[in-house]
Amino acid sequence: MNTPTRHPTPNVTTGALPASRKIYVAGEMHEGIRVPMREIATHPTAGEAPLPVYDSSGPYTDPDVSTDIREGLAPLRAAWIKARCDVEAYSGRDVTAADNGFVEGDRLVPEFPVKPAPLRGRQRAAPTQLAYARAGIITPEMEFVAIRENQLRDLSPCHCARDGEDFGANIPDYVTPEFVRAEIAAGRAIIPANINHPELEPMIIGRNFKVKINANMGTSSVTSSMEEEVDKLVWAIRWGADTVMDLSTGRNIHNTREWIIRNSPVPIGTVPIYQALEKVNGIAEDLTWEVFRDTLIEQAEQGVDYFTIHAGVRLHMVPMTVERVTGIVSRGGSIMAKWCLHHHRESFLYEHFEEICDICRQYDVSFSLGDGLRPGSIADANDAAQFAELETLGELTKIAWAKDCQVMIEGPGHVAMHKIKENMDKQLECCHEAPFYTLGPLTTDIAPGYDHITSGIGAAMIGWFGCAMLCYVTPKEHLGLPDRDDVKTGVITYKIAAHAADLAKGLPGAQRRDDALSRARFEFRWEDQFNLSLDPETAQSFHDETLPKEAHKVAHFCSMCGPKFCSMRISHDIRAEAQKEGFEAMAAKFREGGELYVPLKDTAPEEA
């Protein structure tokens, strides 16, 4: 007798991070706006105000908010969407057996308990942030992200200080709602926010804003479950993921995705061709426009915020990949290339792209135009196939913009460091400054198990050059499906890369957290060092491995140098002695006997 598959209610991690509390900043233009941030407190002896930082963790880190996975999150944006009077509720399509991979009975993931009627744009209305921006309308979402980007900065010199090279970007000292509107209207930024994802806390992706990161997750035909995926979602955003892509394959795709979206405060992206392929039993040649169209509508009704569409893979480009070391490494790209070769025609994604735009326009699903021909090895970087597809993505961008659809462009991949900037420059030129979203890129191919590092190097560089969002890579890349620990490692690695890029491109205020932690380090405030870091738990555990006692939390040394060789302790002694004797006296003392190099007398011959 077969044992029934059990589907327990997922347990997710909640509660604030150390020394942190959730704060909310009210809007001024629109009622009801409360922008979440995390405030990190320092020790009272520091004499410093709490530090506000960007927070994508949603209500899960707010002890004053009760969350129940079975009910989902509160519909934050529902009133904003309704007030615009350009959408309508309708019955929606019926869920079919194919939507969940034909799984039945006790192996079927239960439906999410709450199922609201889906919304769509009325008649010819375009309920997209791009359409509103072009009409001169500043939406609540635009004000929300402006407040969020500023992180309680003001226009004072200390808050607007910047030191970097932005390579021609237009980064303002202070982000206003009007600046957000103008960037979206120009196509340089997007707010991925499906009208059927009201639980979303709006965020912005663009070159002139904070660099964002995405975390991938998803079930496969081999491993993982709905419970694990919901837990990984909450875990990823706890550590700073700005968006999450559900790349599920195998069975139970529809129901698992519903649980994820209803419990996600961040945008959710998908690759619809994966589910469409499951509906035709994994046979790429059997894919049709009708199956794909139905899948788009299914996912749009659920609330997916952005679609990766590999419409740039064209028939004449496929032969360009034959001599590559690693061929076509994109799953979506390889699926469409196989379809094109079998049918010897352009893909239905390319031929029906305007119809795809019409669907996305109805729900404000943003495009993430996929790089199906991205290089899978540094030997293949910047080749003819990659850049031919990029040019096509630029053409498709204009078509989507004409339909009032928001667009970002996906990029590589595997690229050696000296070739990275060319990728950014070509993307800006070919794709008309639409936001760039890259996987890494990985800068070397010799480190399986450490590709979060090989890619973090490239991610920091391309983020500095202008990339708007970085897709994380975990230690399991090329090796297996990431688990909870891998997700955290990938997210933290990419938060480091994104922040390093923000510093390098001169984002105002980016250095505030660095300076706060540096002061804590110099003053031996160990607890503050832990709490101000991206990963307080790991920082403290490393410290406590060798100095675990509470007394060590105030010690003026660590186990690396010990008490006699700590450079910062010696610096404190030098500073104290200088203050005691006076800087002028100290200077005189050094002049008398402290010179390391004695100047030579002038031995040049006198002029005759």
From Swiss-Prot:
Gene Ontology biological process: thiamine biosynthetic process; thiamine diphosphate biosynthetic process
UniProt: Zn(2+) binding residues: H414, H478
Claim: Methyltransferase is one of the keywords in the record: no
Biological pathway: Cofactor biosynthesis; thiamine diphosphate biosynthesis
Quaternary structure and partners: Homodimer.
Family: Belongs to the ThiC family.
Known role: Catalyzes the synthesis of the hydroxymethylpyrimidine phosphate (HMP-P) moiety of thiamine from aminoimidazole ribotide (AIR) in a radical S-adenosyl-L-methionine (SAM)-dependent reaction.
Protein name: Phosphomethylpyrimidine synthase
The organism of origin for this protein: Ruegeria sp. (strain TM1040) (Silicibacter sp.)
Source organism phylogeny: Bacteria, Pseudomonadati, Pseudomonadota, Alphaproteobacteria, Rhodobacterales
